Amino acid sequence: MESSISQTLSKLSDPTTSLVIVVSLFIFISFITRRRRPPYPPGPRGWPIIGNMLMMDQLTHRGLANLAKKYGGLCHLRMGFLHMYAVSSPEVARQVLQVQDSVFSNRPATIAISYLTYDRADMAFAHYGPFWRQMRKVCVMKVFSRKRAESWASVRDEVDKMVRSVSCNVGKPINVGEQIFALTRNITYRAAFGSACEKGQDEFIRILQEFSKLFGAFNVADFIPYFGWIDPQGINKRLVKARNDLDGFIDDIIDEHMKKKENQNAVDDGDVVDTDMVDDLLAFYSEEAKLVSETADLQNSIKLTRDNIKAIIMDVMFGGTETVASAIEWALTELLRSPEDLKRVQQELAEVVGLDRRVEESDIEKLTYLKCTLKETLRMHPPIPLLLHETAEDTSIDGFFIPKKSRVMINAFAIGRDPTSWTDPDTFRPSRFLEPGVPDFKGSNFEFIPFGSGRRSCPGMQLGLYALDLAVAHILHCFTWKLPDGMKPSELDMNDVFGLTAPKATRLFAVPTTRLICAL
């Protein structure tokens, strides 16, 4: 008996035998664990290790909408070691954004996003928690408020500048898309750095474009972390250069603003001084960020570092430039494709405003059909088609398992075109928003969420809508538009390009004719 026991112990001490036992136990425990947890949602079958990475080109708003037709409103994919979920129905969106809002309130971040936002020092990609809550409070009250937006002369000034530019090209085809992008770029740049600041704008736009490319670049290390130290695509070098360029540019601007503030304090004559976004954020500046009680006075409850200020500025530049420009261009494109709706909007402008003056802010709320047109544009072409979230803990939806740190993509594009929520969802029909009970985009109707909903809804919604309303109203009131070279409305290119936003694949060209009898 003792001999048998000693032989058994001798076998167990053998490394190979021990390894087999450990692996067997691991497989057994994994099997038991999997049997106890709910199943994953349906989705396309993946390969070992790489999962569904061969389907990367289908992870667009349109590609995921097509997958939803086969697998339903909650679809599971595995990209390397990362679990990904596509949400394409209002019912599942409600679970994510309302019922389990706290579980899904984190933001996923790629290697590029983490590095370029100074390790999530911004608001857009910071994880949900005390730091994020107070950062959002600062931004909503000081940066993104409607009152603050209306006080920014840059919006009105840049719209006026665009109108004058268009009026110089009456009767000729113009690149409307370029005009609009220049408008939103100038608005956000001046709002961030000062109404008289044009120095280095081209350099900053170059940096912004490189950031955009890096944010959207495929990096295999995001899905298989072991490749991170190899950097087979050379992305790490580009990341370092891009952030160094940004540091050099914005550090100079911050230094200039701090010197200006010191000089103003030294010669305080009581005059009210116009402030920009950098000034607003510098009011909270400290060498080290510090959090106190969330009920404390705002000025004392959070201190921002330079990294925080730079990261927030990049949030605003991305959120306020491409998203608003895309919405304006899509609105004009859809109206040129639907002449009857264009005629109705311009008739309303003539009746409410008159042809003897320009549109003023006080007119906007009276332009009911214009508002319907912009809502329909946001339904069909949401500024950010995929809203990204990350789970803070293991959870389940409709009996399906969603593990911690899963990436959840809420497809605002697919939800806005859900045939169970919208009649003729692929048809541009602004009049649908005149009907009683139609969903609104403020975040409580999950059939229509162009700005998200819940804790992580877009804090810049009011500012974006203000610029959208004002720009489209002026463009349509000041000018009559037609397509160039005898092009028919049905011939307009309605394809988009997927990225952080989904702008038109080709720029809109149109011919303006002066409409007003007053000076432009």
Swiss-Prot record:
Gene Ontology biological-process entries: lignin biosynthetic process; phenylpropanoid biosynthetic process; response to UV-B
SUPFAM superfamilies assigned to the protein according to its UniProt record, in alphabetical order: Cytochrome P450
EC number: 1.14.-.-
Subcellular compartments: Membrane
Modified residues (N-acetylmethionine): 1
Annotated transmembrane regions: 12-32
GO molecular function: heme binding; iron ion binding; monooxygenase activity; oxidoreductase activity, acting on paired donors, with incorporation or reduction of molecular oxygen
Cofactor(s) needed: heme
GO cellular component labels: endoplasmic reticulum; plasma membrane
PROSITE patterns found in the cross-reference section: CYTOCHROME_P450
Pathway listed: Aromatic compound metabolism; phenylpropanoid biosynthesis
Membrane topology (UniProt): Single-pass membrane protein
Uppermost EC category: oxidoreductase
Entry keyword set: Acetylation, Heme, Iron, Membrane, Metal-binding, Monooxygenase, Oxidoreductase, Transmembrane, Transmembrane helix
Keyword NADP: no
The organism's place on the tree of life at top rank: Eukaryota
Residues annotated for heme binding in this entry: 458
Family: Belongs to the cytochrome P450 family.
Protein name: Cytochrome P450 84A1
